[in-house]
Amino acid sequence: MQVVVLAGGLSPERDVSLRSGRRIAKALRAATDFEVIESDVDATLLARLRAQTPDCVIPVLHGAAGEDGALRDVLQSLNIPFVGSIAAACRLAFDKPVAKTLLSNAGVNTPAAVALPHSTFRELGASEVLAAVLDSVGLPLIVKPTKGGSALGAALVHEAAQFPAAMVGSFAYSDVALMESWVQGVEVAVSVLETPTGPKALPLAEVVPLSEIYDYTARYTAGTTEFFVPARLSADVAQGCADVALTAHKVLGLRDWSRTDLIVDAAGTPWFLEVNVAPGMTETSLFPQSLAAAELSLGEITAQLVRTAIERG
């Protein structure tokens, strides 16, 4: 059986994607006799896929093309089975304001937020728009691109003077910025895995960064973040977090695996932040840590998802 692991691409998260792809490929080789091919994504990809005719593809691309559904649309058009969510579900999950709205409509708590394109600030005047957002959302707030991951372009704003620079940083990664109320509490990631009996939440991962927010450096530099898996939460609160992640997985129509990021406030209430259709698989990533806490093998689980994808066709 030939399996192609797609990683890399041109997004700002290229390096993380390559690290995730290498780890998945290594785990698959150790757990199976599959022929595992690691492949970057460039203008030669489609020709290579047609020549290789793989039995299955595992997209491990982060950011645009990998998580916005575009590549998966192409794989579907080529009738190549792949692990992960279909394109339509990816588009819903990748757009943070859309995902927040859908989850809010499903009864899930999500912080108050405003999403505005760069053009609005030019047309209406940056100072007036920023003042209106502050009145609506309040401080502190976090600014982040509406599309993208790894906390690239994210900044925490404690006072109005920090707001303009935070917006500039966000617009460097996306034309639309999300300005979201900052909920203080415990940061938790809930990984969801599809099983023969349905989606299951894995042991929760609690994230304690040395920096103020769980930014790119804190995510991918060893020693900059402390992890607790399972999270140091009561059974009831942990179940509440798992329920939110399972709701996100279902409402957005996700498939195979996902990871939902939450904040648990002082009252034990989980607040939905975002969901990832291509969870990171690096040495410091949360999905593999939750798998390990459940005494599950990354290679064996991925192999099972490959077999399921092939059966789906």
PLM feature spans:
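Active-site nucleotide/adenylate-binding loops and adjacent lid/helix of ATP-dependent enzymes
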Residues: 1-7, 49, 92-185
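Hydrophobic beta-strand scaffold residues
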Residues: 36, 81-82, 110, 141, ...
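Short beta-strand-to-turn element immediately C-terminal to the catalytic PLP-Schiff-base lysine
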Residues: 116, 154-159, 192-195, 265, ...
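Phosphate-binding site of ATP-dependent enzymes
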Residues: 158-243, 269-271
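ATP-dependent carboxylate activation and anion-phosphoryl transfer catalytic cores
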Residues: 234-313
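Short, flexible, mixed-charge acidic loops at enzyme active sites
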Residues: 70-77, 214-221, 277
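ATP-binding N-terminal substructure of ATP-dependent carboxylate-amine bond-forming enzymes
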Residues: 1-101, 105, 117-132, 308-313
